[in-house]
Curated annotation (Swiss-Prot):
It catalyses: N2 + 8 reduced [2Fe-2S]-[ferredoxin] + 16 ATP + 16 H2O = H2 + 8 oxidized [2Fe-2S]-[ferredoxin] + 2 NH4(+) + 16 ADP + 16 phosphate + 6 H(+). It comes from Cereibacter sphaeroides (strain ATCC 17023 / DSM 158 / JCM 6121 / CCUG 31486 / LMG 2827 / NBRC 12203 / NCIMB 8253 / ATH 2.4.1.). Keywords: 4Fe-4S, ADP-ribosylation, ATP-binding, Iron, Iron-sulfur, Metal-binding, Nitrogen fixation, Nucleotide-binding, Oxidoreductase. This is Nitrogenase iron protein. The modification ADP-ribosylarginine is found at residue 102. The gene is nifH.
């Protein structure tokens, strides 16, 4: 068994991060890789398609029921899913109470101390990325996740979140070994989406790993709580995820320290692509409409 690769999928809420990560990991396990998924999103939906079940009980929830995390056994929190993928969800507190990041820290420490990382090739963290607060940045900050893949699209807020996540990676890149593996663009069919994703990758100094086309088969599979790899293994979309998995597998050691841009530079880039109007153009358009 080679060196353990600790990867993380970050991205803004609703971008399709959990779906993309689970389909990619299902493709990786087909390639003979042994995988542990650590869900770090309070929604606790990072393992649903691999386990083919409703939401998994989280480490924090089980610890609260048992009395403390020390009262848990590894088999209480790790479930086995598609082709032997190990799955666990860190979980988070009740909305409005406490820090969700604390659950991530508690869960990862428990898993490491109890041998969950011992016989796997990949540990994959699925992390909420709108807020790069201390807790959610923990897999980066504590030098756990070494390769970060940002799931984004051509939408303004997805680009903004991707740049913000790159800032978080840069902050910890020198003190730890964390690197940006690259961008994964989940197609939303916005204008000039692939070009825009490639332009942002160039500005961040990283690769555009893969452009995942939009396909309704993803939703059909999700309704059955399955990945596309499991639901429609011969489909074109399954091949896209296999290609993405292959690119990530071959990207070992090729991550970069990102070069995030300012908000002004991001807006300028969007203007260059005609996605966003400058204030002058906006006012001119209003004046023309009123004339």
């Amino acid at each position: 068994m080679g060196k353990l690769r600790q990867i993380a999928f970050y991205g803004k809420g609703g971008i399709g991060k959990s779906t993309t990560s689970q389909n990619t990991l299902a493709a990786l396990v087909e390639m003979g890789q042994k995988i542990l998924i650590v869900g770090c999103d309070p929604k606790a939906d990072s393992t649903r398609l691999i386990l083919n079940t409703k939401l998994q009980d989280t480490v924090l929830h089980l610890a609260a029921e048992a009395g403390s995390v020390e009262d848990l056994e590894l088999e209480d929190v790790v479930k086995i899913g598609y082709k032997g993928i190990k799955c666990t969800e860190a979980g988070g507190p009740e909305p409005g109470v406490g820090c969700a990041g604390r659950g991530v820290i508690t869960a990862i420490n428990f898993l490491e101390e109890n041998g969950a990382y011992d016989d796997v090739d990949y540990v994959s963290y699925d992390v909420l990325g709108d807020v790069v607060c201390g807790g959610f940045a923990m897999p980066i900050r504590e030098n756990k996740a070494q390769e970060i893949y940002i799931v984004m699209s051509g939408e303004m807020m997805a680009l903004y979140a991707a740049n913000n996540i790159a800032k978080g990676i840069l902050k910890y890149a020198n003190s730890g070994g964390v690197r940006l593996g690259g961008l994964i663009c989940n197609e939303r069919k916005t204008d000039r989406e692939l070009e825009l994703a490639e332009a942002l990758a160039a500005r961040l100094g990283c690769k555009m790993i893969h452009f995942v086309p939009r396909d309704n088969i993803v939703q059909h599979a999700e309704l059955r709580r399955e990945t596309v790899i499991q639901y429609a293994p011969e489909s074109k979309q399954a091949q896209e995820y296999r290609e993405l998995a292959r690119k990530i597998h071959e990207n070992s050691g090729k991550g970069v320290i990102p070069t995030p841009i300012t908000m002004e530079e991001l807006e300028e880039m969007l203007m260059d692509f005609g996605i966003m109007q400058s204030e002058e153009d906006r006012l001119a358009a209003i004046a023309a409409a009123e004339a």
